[in-house]
A protein has these predicted regions:
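Short amphipathic alpha-helical segments enriched in leucine
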Residues: 21, 60-64, 98
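N-terminal export leaders
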Residues: 11-37, 113, 134
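Post-signal-peptide N-terminal segment of Sec-exported extracytoplasmic proteins
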Residues: 66-72
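C-terminal segment of N-terminal export signals and the immediately downstream linker at the start
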Residues: 10-14, 30-64
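Mature-region segments of soluble proteins
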Residues: 2, 55-58, 72-175
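Residues marking the start of alpha-helices
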Residues: 7, 44, 106-108
Length: 175
């Protein structure tokens, strides 16, 4: 009796899962989706384009730079601009920002590799209403996130816990 063996294998579970993930990711990216560089967070946009949202996130990071604060928190801070009310102001502002970057020889603001060069571009338009709106709203949008407080060592408000007098008022050790 002769045994016939073949090396033909069907698709493995691993290959099936990899294929499904790739298809799912390509569908999501095509539908107003912004993902962080670490891919640990993602955001869906409705009224602004993913490119505009990515530019806003980079702009926020350049205005208030903190190396220990993840992009996710900057994304949350600018998420409010993804609305019908801000749509035209964001589009016009990003176009002006990209035009300023193109004047420096770059394709867009997002393609400027060095923070110092991006800051110069921002300084050139710091008197614009677009810049002032973004900068002003970032103060509360970024720093009012309780998750960010812990990154800066801020324990939050103390009124509900009896105030600061008996709770950490004298615990500083750097004086």
């Amino acid at each position: 009796m002769e045994t016939i063996t073949t090396n033909a294998r069907g698709i493995s579970r691993r290959d099936l899962l990899k294929g499904c993930v790739m298809v799912g990711a390509s569908l999501a990216v095509g539908s107003g989706f912004v993902a962080g560089s670490s891919a640990a967070w993602a955001m869906e946009t409705i009224h602004v384009t993913p490119s505009e949202m990515a530019t806003l996130i980079q702009m926020a990071r350049d205005i208030y730079p903190h190396n220990h604060v993840a992009d996710e928190y900057y994304a949350r801070a600018v998420k409010g601009y993804d609305s019908e009310d801000f749509k035209s102001q964001i589009a016009e502002g990003i176009n002006a920002l990209n035009a300023a970057a193109q004047g420096q020889g770059y394709a867009s603001y997002l393609t400027v590799p060095w923070e110092a060069d991006r800051v110069k571009i921002l300084q050139s338009m710091e008197d614009s209403s677009f810049f002032q709106t973004i900068r002003g709203n970032l103060i509360t949008g970024l720093y009012n996130q309780p998750e960010v407080w812990t990154l800066f060592g801020y324990e939050g408000e103390s009124y509900s816990k009896g105030g600061y007098i008996n709770r950490g008022f004298n615990d500083i050790n750097w004086i």
